[in-house]
Amino acid sequence: MSWQQRVDDALTARRATDTLRRRYVVSQGAGRWLVANGRQYLNFSSNDYLGLSQHPQIIRAWQQAATRFGVGSGGSGHISGYSVAHQALEEELAQWLGYPRALLFISGFAANQAVITALMKKNDRIVADRLSHASLLEAANLSPAQLRRFIHNDTQHLSRLLQSPCVGQQLVVTEGVYSMDGDSAPLAEIQHIARRHHAWLLVDDAHGIGVTGDEGRGTCWQRGGKPELLVVTFGKGFGVSGAAVLCSESVADYLLQFARHLVYSTSMPPAQAQALSASLAVIRSDEGRERREKLAALVQRFRAGVNASRFTLLNAHSAIQPLIVGDNSRALRLAEALRQQGCWATAIRPPTVPVGTARLRLTLTQAHEACDIDRLLEVLHGAGE
């Protein structure tokens, strides 16, 4: 088979199963409204949960820092790219979340890959929730460690897997809030089981940080867990982009030596770090609390109004509200029907989710109003299916 035949066959297979992904060009993609092809839609696909991507204080912080530092960092943090803005943000994050150290990464994907790649060796074992993010599972598959996956949020299955003999070290991997199901992991129980078996715990709290817990400290704080490795990302609740790993002093020093994604990547722009510090200040303030409370009320309003006889609504109380429709083509038709009525929603299909669980992944944000939720419910219930 030639290279071209391999490429063509893969694309043909995706088209045949209604799983071919496509991108949409938008002129505004975050906030209450999405604008595409000159038309305005209510936006139910954004991860900007607290509406901070449009916050004037955060925008101003980035602009001022860009004037001071320029628009790029100029190099890896190990060469010339670790500025006072990066240092200040790392210290603020560590203090806020109660860890000795924080290390910044250019993305959550890079952070997850870096930690697992740097830590795991031959004869080690990774025990990951089967619904863990692609960045975690890919890193686990590529590492020299053995990967075992436990049934989603099933702590008994996790315990059984950890009990089986392992010559090396064991790492338990889970998420705080799951990106496709919107539910949360039983983190306190998972942590207890991990420690009983002398395993470390890595939690990716991309969708919980900033949005849940006291001062927005996230799912671990809310549920009483403190993993050895906490990954937080800044493209959701923070409204910006990037990520950080929270850990001990020694683990931070280790990652600075052996995390190739960190050592060999240009660091985030200092202006971005400054904007993230401004975002953190909003998250921790009374305004941040009010934004979280408004979002929670909108989620409750939506869940109370969904017609459960027509859609499978998962037990999710986060900003992520998936409606399971099962069939790929039906999910695509439903997303298109919503767009025709001015509501932008995304159909999620395999391989992102298991076969037979195609869904509309609806995301609610603080930028929405109650009337937006009511409109979404009206359109959903009127969609001709």
UniProtKB/Swiss-Prot annotation:
Q: What class of enzyme is it?
A: transferase
Which cofactors does it use? pyridoxal 5'-phosphate
Q: Which Pfam families match?
A: Aminotran_1_2
- Where N6-(pyridoxal phosphate)lysine occurs, residue numbers? 236
- Domain of life where this protein originates: Bacteria
Catalysed reaction(s) here are:
6-carboxyhexanoyl-[ACP] + L-alanine + H(+) = (8S)-8-amino-7-oxononanoate + holo-[ACP] + CO2
EC number annotated for this UniProt entry: 2.3.1.47
What pathway does the UniProt record associate with this protein? Cofactor biosynthesis; biotin biosynthesis
Record: residues binding pyridoxal 5'-phosphate? 108-109, 179, 207, 233
Q: Which residues bind substrate?
A: 21, 133, 352
What are the BP-aspect GO terms? biotin biosynthetic process
One example of the protein's molecular function in GO is: 8-amino-7-oxononanoate synthase activity
Going by the UniProt record, its keywords in alphabetical order are: Biotin biosynthesis, Pyridoxal phosphate, Transferase
Purpose of the protein: Catalyzes the decarboxylative condensation of pimeloyl-[acyl-carrier protein] and L-alanine to produce 8-amino-7-oxononanoate (AON), [acyl-carrier protein], and carbon dioxide.
Of which family is this protein a member? Belongs to the class-II pyridoxal-phosphate-dependent aminotransferase family. BioF subfamily.
Q: How does it assemble?
A: Homodimer.
Q: Which HAMAP family match?
A: BioF_aminotrans_2
Query: Can you name this protein?
Result: 8-amino-7-oxononanoate synthase
Biological source species: Salmonella dublin (strain CT_02021853)
Q: What is the lineage of its organism?
A: Bacteria, Pseudomonadati, Pseudomonadota, Gammaproteobacteria, Enterobacterales
